[in-house]
Amino acid sequence: MGTFLARLIEEWGLGAPHIVGPDVGTAAALFLAANAPDRVTSLTIGGGAVRAPIDAGGALKDVIEAPSLDVVRQLDARTNIGFAVEPVAGADSEPDVHEDYVSAYDLGRFAESARFVRHYPDQNPVLRGLLPSITTPAQIISGREDDLVPWSNNEYLADLLPNSEIHPLDAGHFAWEQASDEYGRLIVDWVTGGFQRS
């Protein structure tokens, strides 16, 4: 995915943008910074299961550890995704938003998207070797109460990335929604000069 991002940045003539890549975007952004550092000015990452060994919970752990993609295909995608998004888009409180999240994984898209996280057991050890060499300034923002991607993933990044700072938020997995004001404020501060602190 990092290679794809580098090509996209080149094709769209974006220069060296500030990358905001929470959740699964964390690994992609880090691979981009490791392999094409000239393509990125800074990173805002966090909430991705990037540790080696993997530290994940709930349905994410089940998907990563499933013996095959066929097993993932048998999982009830609507239930799994519905449970994950309930704290930020409740089926009763925001039915349209909830349905949008859940239906995005219908028609086999849940299993197909699971291919990405199922590569973590192979990719995370490679990423671990690259992290100390990534000099791109990195801001790590995530919810401290994330049941899918425990806080230890963010501490791991802060320990291994030489130019990083970490910001725990009072939120779960969807920190950008659950603590949107603070999340947005941190990003604005970062891209308007804060990244130069690291």
Regions found by a protein language model. Give the residues of each.
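Helix-loop "lid/cap" segments that line or gate small-molecule binding pockets
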Residues: 79-93, 100-104, 115-122
